[in-house]
């Protein structure tokens, strides 16, 4: 159940926040400690809410006696739920329950530390409590996933959420984790706790279609330059696929623990970005022929506990070149970089009859790819010395690339759309294919692997168009 937090601070602001959210939410938490309203006005807000939660965070200067008195006065307003800190006296909870038997009690704990939530729950357990809320602070994505795993072992009357930016995915996954409450804020309001998402954000992530039976799709690696969450979630919604797509920042060092976690959680598909495309291969149960050919993996499919790796990067770029009527036979093609995407592209283009030239800052890495696909390897500084028909840039946007020209330039980076290399090439009259085109094509290939029973040919153009618009918008914002 979505629960929108009302913080005001004035009565008028609080009422507007509540009324603005009523179409999308029925449950509202009134933060009495943040509201500058009278008890009569607070009562009006409670009556406006179909389901109400009343919370008052005890300030450090408040005495135990004053705390109890304040909570007793709030109980007299008859909210649906009363949220009490874990340290609120047990005997006073029993007294409130005796006087107000219809009020349901939530016992909550917020901590800035990452702690074993099973132990926390055990410490909070009491017969007088209806619901429990645990808010903890994960230090990493693997911490986050371990917390999600632990949540499955707790009773269904327990809400577990993670604070901070790292913890945002736990809020998106809340219905899948069977949380009784999913806390959100009115659209346009400031967060009350770090990592809170707006009501519109939750709807964007397909909240109304999510349930404990839903599966999860995600992006792992350096997620900072991806627009995948902005393209994939609306696409899933259009197809009525009850699945969110979340970003999970991950380093190579975290892979062992990550793979333990995803086997215990309902993951269906995972996109893999740098720097994990080659590092991830030893953890796969099976490799598709595309991975065996390229030595790179950008797609995981999880079925019946088995993790299968695929590579759609090279095929995605080849689809783009085909759409642009680019015939590569007997052409000289330069690939800049020696990472996972460069490997994938070299593997696919090696079957087109073109002559491949691999350029990299560390020549030995270029040689490793070249030897595999009968290509030539060069230091990146030698790029201007070679005449080619096509340059495919697989280096990061911040890379310093020698000024070189070709009739057609492909830059596979989605964000930023423009960089010094493409700007120079465009100034000199070269045709440019930007990264959002390859992004869209490789993603559509991933969707076919994740959702083989769905037909979405009619939506492909809209998906590609959305990727193009987002890449342009983010470049303008930058």
Swiss-Prot record:
Reactions that this protein is recorded to catalyse: 3-dehydroquinate = 3-dehydroshikimate + H2O; shikimate + NADP(+) = 3-dehydroshikimate + NADPH + H(+)
CDD domains recorded: DHQase_I, NAD_bind_Shikimate_DH
Catalytic residues (positions): 110, 133, 277
Pfam families named in the record: DHquinase_I, Shikimate_DH, Shikimate_dh_N
Residues covered by region (3-dehydroquinate dehydratase): 1-208
Source superkingdom: Bacteria
GO BP field: 3,4-dihydroxybenzoate biosynthetic process; amino acid biosynthetic process; aromatic amino acid family biosynthetic process; chorismate biosynthetic process; shikimate metabolic process
One of the record's GO molecular function terms: 3-dehydroquinate dehydratase activity
E.C. no: 4.2.1.10, 1.1.1.25
Shikimate 5-dehydrogenase: annotated span: 209-478
InterPro entries: Aldolase_TIM, Aminoacid_DH-like_N_sf, DHquinase_I, NAD(P)-bd_dom_sf, Shikimate_DH, Shikimate_DH-bd_N, Shikm_DH/Glu-tRNA_Rdtase, Type-I_3-dehydroquinase
Binding residues for shikimate: 226-228, 298, 313, 442
Residue sites binding NADP(+) per the record: 337-341, 360-362, 435
Chain sites annotated for binding 3-dehydroquinate: 21, 29-31, 55-57, 171, 196
UniProt keyword list: Amino-acid biosynthesis, Aromatic amino acid biosynthesis, Lyase, Multifunctional enzyme, NADP, Oxidoreductase, Schiff base
Pathway the protein takes part in: Metabolic intermediate biosynthesis; chorismate biosynthesis; chorismate from D-erythrose 4-phosphate and phosphoenolpyruvate: step 3/7; Metabolic intermediate biosynthesis; chorismate biosynthesis; chorismate from D-erythrose 4-phosphate and phosphoenolpyruvate: step 4/7
Signal peptide: none
Similarity annotation: In the N-terminal section; belongs to the type-I 3-dehydroquinase family.
HAMAP family per the UniProt record, alphabetical: AroD
Summary of the function given for this chain in its UniProt record: Bifunctional enzyme that catalyzes two sequential steps of the aromatic amino acids biosynthetic pathway. In the first reaction, the AroD domain catalyzes the cis-dehydration of 3-dehydroquinate (DHQ) and introduces the first double bond of the aromatic ring to yield 3-dehydroshikimate; in the second reaction, the AroE domain catalyzes the reversible NADPH linked reduction of 3-dehydroshikimate (DHSA) to yield shikimate (SA).
Protein name: Shikimate biosynthesis protein AroDE
Provenance organism: Chlamydia muridarum (strain MoPn / Nigg)
Lineage of origin: Bacteria, Pseudomonadati, Chlamydiota, Chlamydiia, Chlamydiales
């Amino acid at each position: 159940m979505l629960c929108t937090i009302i913080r005001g601070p004035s009565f008028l602001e609080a009422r507007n926040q509540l009324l603005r959210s009523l179409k999308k939410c029925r449950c509202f938490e009134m933060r009495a400690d943040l509201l500058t309203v009278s008890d009569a006005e607070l009562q009006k807000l409670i009556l406006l809410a179909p389901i109400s939660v009343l919370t008052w965070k005890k300030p450090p200067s408040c005495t135990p006696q004053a705390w109890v008195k304040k909570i007793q006065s709030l109980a007299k307003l008859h909210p649906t739920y009363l949220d009490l800190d874990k340290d609120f006296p047990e005997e006073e909870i029993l007294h409130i329950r005796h006087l107000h038997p219809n009020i349901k009690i939530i016992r909550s704990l917020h901590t800035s530390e990452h702690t074993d939530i099973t132990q926390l729950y055990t410490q909070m357990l009491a017969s007088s409590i209806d619901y429990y809320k645990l808010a903890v602070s994960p230090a990493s994505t693997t911490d986050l996933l371990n917390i999600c795993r632990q949540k499955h072992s707790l009773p269904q009357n327990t809400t577990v959420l993670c604070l901070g930016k790292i913890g945002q995915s736990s809020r998106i996954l809340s219905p899948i984790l069977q949380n009784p409450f999913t806390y959100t804020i009115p659209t346009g309001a400031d967060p009350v706790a770090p990592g809170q998402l707006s009501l519109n954000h939750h709807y964007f992530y397909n909240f109304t279609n999510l349930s404990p039976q839903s599966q999860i799709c995600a992006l792992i690696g350096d997620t900072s330059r991806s627009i995948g969450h902005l393209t994939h979630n609306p696409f899933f919604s259009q197809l009525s696929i009850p699945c969110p797509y979340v970003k999970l920042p991950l380093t190579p060092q975290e892979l062992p623990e990550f793979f333990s976690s995803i086997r215990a959680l309902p993951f269906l598909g995972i996109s893999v970005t740098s720097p994990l495309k080659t590092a991830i291969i030893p953890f796969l149960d099976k490799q598709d022929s595309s991975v065996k050919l390229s030595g790179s993996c950008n797609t995981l499919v999880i079925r019946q506990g088995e993790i299968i790796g695929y590579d759609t990067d090279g095929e995605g770029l080849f689809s783009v070149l085909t759409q642009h009527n680019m015939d590569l036979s007997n052409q000289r093609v330069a690939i800049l970089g020696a990472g996972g995407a460069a490997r994938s592209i070299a593997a696919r283009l090696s079957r087109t009859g073109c002559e491949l030239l691999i350029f990299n800052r560390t020549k030995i890495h270029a040689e490793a790819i070249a030897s595999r696909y009968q290509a030539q390897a060069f230091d990146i500084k030698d790029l201007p010395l070679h005449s080619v028909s096509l340059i495919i840039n697989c280096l990061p946007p911040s890379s310093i690339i020698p000024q070189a020209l070709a009739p057609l330039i492909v830059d596979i980076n989605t964000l930023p759309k423009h960089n010094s290399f493409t700007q120079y090439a465009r100034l000199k009259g070269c045709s440019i294919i930007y990264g959002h085109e390859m992004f869209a094509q490789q993603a559509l290939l991933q969707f076919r692997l994740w959702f083989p029973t769905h037909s979405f040919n009619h939506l492909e153009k809209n998906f590609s168009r959305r990727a193009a618009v987002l890449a342009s918008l983010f470049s303008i914002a930058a």
